[in-house]
Amino acid sequence: MSMILKEIRMNNFKSHVNSRIKFEKGIVAIIGENGSGKSSIFEAVFFALFGAGSNFNYDTIITKGKKSVYVELDFEVNGNNYKIIREYDSGRGGAKLYKNGKPYATTISAVNKAVNEILGVDRNMFLNSIYIKQGEIAKFLSLKPSEKLETVAKLLGIDEFEKCYQKMGEIVKEYEKRLERIEGELNYKENYEKELKNKMSQLEEKNKKLMEINDKLNKIKKEFEDIEKLFNEWENKKLLYEKFINKLEERKRALELKNQELKILEYDLNTVVEARETLNRHKDEYEKYKSLVDEIRKIESRLRELKSHYEDYLKLTKQLEIIKGDIEKLKEFINKSKYRDDIDNLDTLLNKIKDEIERVETIKDLLEELKNLNEEIEKIEKYKRICEECKEYYEKYLELEEKAVEYNKLTLEYITLLQEKKSIEKNINDLETRINKLLEETKNIDIESIENSLKEIEEKKKVLENLQKEKIELNKKLGEINSEIKRLKKILDELKEVEGKCPLCKTPIDENKKMELINQHKTQLNNKYTELEEINKKIREIEKDIEKLKKEIDKEENLKTLKTLYLEKQSQIEELELKLKNYKEQLDEINKKISNYVINGKPVDEILEDIKSQLNKFKNFYNQYLSAVSYLNSVDEEGIRNRIKEIENIVSGWNKEKCREELNKLREDEREINRLKDKLNELKNKEKELIEIENRRSLKFDKYKEYLGLTEKLEELKNIKDGLEEIYNICNSKILAIDNIKRKYNKEDIEIYLNNKILEVNKEINDIEERISYINQKLDEINYNEEEHKKIKELYENKRQELDNVREQKTEIETGIEYLKKDVESLKARLKEMSNLEKEKEKLTKFVEYLDKVRRIFGRNGFQAYLREKYVPLIQKYLNEAFSEFDLPYSFVELTKDFEVRVHAPNGVLTIDNLSGGEQIAVALSLRLAIANALIGNRVECIILDEPTVYLDENRRAKLAEIFRKVKSIPQMIIITHHRELEDVADVIINVKKDGNVSKVKING
């Protein structure tokens, strides 16, 4: 592909908000730190050429916070200049292609098609040819032969045929499984034929029984109609009898209620008359009692007003007695004090005592300070001795501590490696355990049987759906019948209660016509009940079938879960085995690193422990030395000694005991004077309080005296009231009784009302007694006998039960016939399916044989081998052309059919492993360029390498840079890298760096 990149512009493409890059011929190095946005440049080139693939999300390329993206790419192919513009804004995308400055394609699909034609490659071939992925060269050097073959096959697209081969294998297996299932089903054909013959015989027998039961049913129906007619006559007689009985009960209840009402009226009248007489006898006593109550209330009200004054007077009297006692005690205390003669000079005496206490306290504090300073001098002498004894150990400790820092760092690295090793070993054990467990769990799962069961359940679901539809229809019919039954019952109830007019047509009706209508509707009702029972029976049978099917269908979820579980576990096993391989490789690498941390046969952690042991031995001396030096540096020894001399001059002749005795004496005198002062103040306050209380008490005396007089009068009036209270209560109860009866009847002139009401009720009682006599006469005329009715009803019920039993037998036989017919139809259909399966088996057998032949063509020994043979000489040719540019002392590079590289040297044939590091890189790069040329079919003019130096050590990076310098056959080589070594070989350097979240580009020619 003779394409040369010339320029790209990016607006809002990932971290490139506004970047423009011109590409020159030669080696172009795009250099920047990881995450700077250098790889995004190639992504923009790829997007410009091939656009958005399937399931592409523009949010992945648009700069965060922006809504649009714009990429413009200029390139040259076969002397023609092309410009592609791709943009996307707010949900709408667009593309344009220009050839030599003129529009060439203006829609996305047209541009995509034109680019494929111009370049001669699609997006996948582009990636496999001119674009060399990150670390691909370094990785190729470390691959095993089988992995190298796989990698080259993938680049050439041969692996797609292997995928077809594998996929067709899966398809063949599916068809083979289908064949096995068909053969399994055909094994049942003979059984179905025998079962069909048996069902036909059973159907013939059932039809004979149905004819017999129909004859029996007709006979019983005639007998039932005769007994039903007689039964209906007695039912009508019972209805009429019960009607009059109910009316008789109603009249008796009404009579009883009226008699009760009469008794209550007579009782209330007597109560009113008696109450009037009692009130007239005791009128004077009642009025006097009410007058006394009013007077007592007034006195009690005044007493409540005076009570607080009365209580205050008593309280103040008590307080006077207490204060007089307190004054006597205070005077007695003052007369006993030793300072009673100096009462006027107490404050002067107190100040002198306080000054003396302060002087003695100062001497006491100086004595304590002197003691502490002498102890401090002793401490200084002690720490001087410690410094001399511990200095040698302190210096040894510092030497060991320096070593400990060095070995501590090594030990941390060593322990980290050990922990990694332990973690990896644990992961290996866990993975092996999990793999074995998964293998054990899947061993007993028969996946083929599960799939067969799931297909059978799908068939049962269809049967269930049909049954449920049938049940819904029957339930609708049930609703219609129940509505009709309710209607008939309502008509019957209305007919039983009717008197004179038909409830349906409102025309006049006699008893005979009424009974005729009742019988007609009862017959209709019985027919509906029979129909209702037949439908309910059919619904119950359907529900049994539904329940049976649901139990089978309920197994589906478990089977699906089991199938999913099996497939998941198989996937897990493959994934875990790959992880196990990686962990074992990591373990080998870590074991090599660990050996570097053993010095003279001893691990660094043990050496560190020895050092720590010695440090612990000297640590106490080290700490003592530091503490002593720190303390001696912090104290002023000379100042302390001067202060001692100063204090000794001041406290001469004093000691602690003398200070204590003098202070106790002075403080006792101080307390005595303060107590005397407090008592004098208290006496003054008490005398003042005494005068105040005496004045307050004299103001309360008049009301106190009034309270005592009223209390005496109240007692006298209450005694008179108590003598009249019984008569008052009797009168009150009589007044209340009359008021209650007035409220009860809501009448003021109650005696007249009650007399009139009694006459009215007596008249109503006579009317009810006459009606009861008429009803008894009608009951005698009906002449209803309950025992005779019961006998006829029993005959009716027995005959009806017999009729129902025969109908049920008939229904059972008819149901059996229907089931047999369905079974026969089902078996015939099944046998027809068997015939179709035999034809399908024949077709499938031929088709599987054909697929297997086609599959072998796509296999490794088929078309894949042909492609490898075709590509090998072509790649070998381009390989030698590229390799010859490096001026290495080899005559020829051979490529085997398995894509193994052999280098022919003067002294023999060498493999890639026999070459030096630089020679290996030259071979790998030459092979990669040769594959690109072979894919495109002509000379590659532009190649892009993404991080080719990743995974290479410093030496190999330098050799790769030198190899790039020698490549002359490729006009344009674009290298994306973060290693600065490649700057020396580049013709153009494009530096990419991040400024915040935005990529900035700078070109150095």
UniProtKB/Swiss-Prot annotation:
ATP binds at residues 14, 35-40, 62-64, 134. GO terms for molecular function: ATP binding; ATP hydrolysis activity; DNA exonuclease activity; zinc ion binding. Its cofactor is Zn(2+). GO terms for biological process: DNA repair; double-strand break repair. It holds the Pfam family Rad50_zn_hook. Residues 189-230, 292-321, 346-379, 404-498, 523-600, 656-692, 800-834 form a coiled coil. The keyword RNA-binding does not apply. Residues 457-554 form the Zinc-hook domain. Binds 1 zinc ion per homodimer. One of its GO terms (cellular component) is DNA repair complex. Zn(2+) binds at residues 502, 505. Keywords: ATP-binding, Coiled coil, DNA damage, DNA repair, Hydrolase, Metal-binding, Nucleotide-binding, Zinc. The two conserved Cys that bind zinc constitute the zinc-hook, which separates the large intramolecular coiled coil regions. The 2 Cys residues coordinate one molecule of zinc with the help of the 2 Cys residues of the zinc-hook of another Rad50 molecule, thereby forming a V-shaped homodimer. Part of the Rad50/Mre11 complex, which is involved in the early steps of DNA double-strand break (DSB) repair. The complex may facilitate opening of the processed DNA ends to aid in the recruitment of HerA and NurA. Rad50 controls the balance between DNA end bridging and DNA resection via ATP-dependent structural rearrangements of the Rad50/Mre11 complex. Homodimer. Forms a heterotetramer composed of two Mre11 subunits and two Rad50 subunits. Belongs to the SMC family. RAD50 subfamily. This is DNA double-strand break repair Rad50 ATPase. It comes from Methanocaldococcus jannaschii (strain ATCC 43067 / DSM 2661 / JAL-1 / JCM 10045 / NBRC 100440) (Methanococcus jannaschii).
